[in-house]
Amino acid sequence: MELSLLNIKGKDTGKKVVLSDDIFAVEPNNHAIYLDVKQYLAHQRQGTHKAKERAEVSFSTKKLKKQKGTGGARAGSRKSPIFVGGGTIFGPRPRTYGFKVNKKVKDLARKSAFSHKLKESNVTVLENFTLNAPKTKDYLAILKDLSLDTKKTLFVIADIDKNIILSSRNLKKAKVVSVDQINTYDLVNADKVVISEGSVSKIEALLN
């Protein structure tokens, strides 16, 4: 699969970039995508929820009333879950929501996401570039030249570039990741995926 290489002005440079069919032209596996996205979102949960049970609420342990003769039900402790303010029965406890997804499945999910985006013509390959300073205005100008300023865009760069990352951080619909930070959720969530020329070989090395 070949794509035209664009410069930061959105113009065709006349060069072609070859993308591996093993990554960008596989039959998308929706279940693999589902599992990887589900795992990613599960790991975002704090899991710090907690409700006090009867052993943890603070009340006197004195028997509320005598055992017999009142005509009412027996009551031994104010901490009982049947009373307002008493302990919670089977309440939430701190837990980890994460679960394991095999590496082969995760790789297949990312390949499927890339292939799906390319099939819909939502992948662009961009010439390598750097910014002299972290300026949101400069990064936004690049997105406008690429007609991507109104779309959710995932920009994949070969290595972490502090100026590019800081320049994009304040833009709600723009996200920049290095190759080793690519995840299925970001790929699926983006309207457009922009790949720097230098990151193509690294993506192939990561997923092959």
From Swiss-Prot:
Alphabetical GO biological process terms: translation
Record's keyword terms, sorted: Ribonucleoprotein, Ribosomal protein, RNA-binding, rRNA-binding
Gene3D superfamilies linked: 3.40.1370.10
GO cellular component: ribonucleoprotein complex; ribosome
Pfam families, per the entry: Ribosomal_L4
Start and end residues of each stretch annotated as Disordered: 51-79
HAMAP family the record matches: Ribosomal_uL4_B
Biological role stated in the UniProt entry: One of the primary rRNA binding proteins, this protein initially binds near the 5'-end of the 23S rRNA. It is important during the early stages of 50S assembly. It makes multiple contacts with different domains of the 23S rRNA in the assembled 50S subunit and ribosome. Forms part of the polypeptide exit tunnel.
Subunit structure: Part of the 50S ribosomal subunit.
Protein name: Large ribosomal subunit protein uL4
Natural source organism: Cytophaga hutchinsonii (strain ATCC 33406 / DSM 1761 / CIP 103989 / NBRC 15051 / NCIMB 9469 / D465)
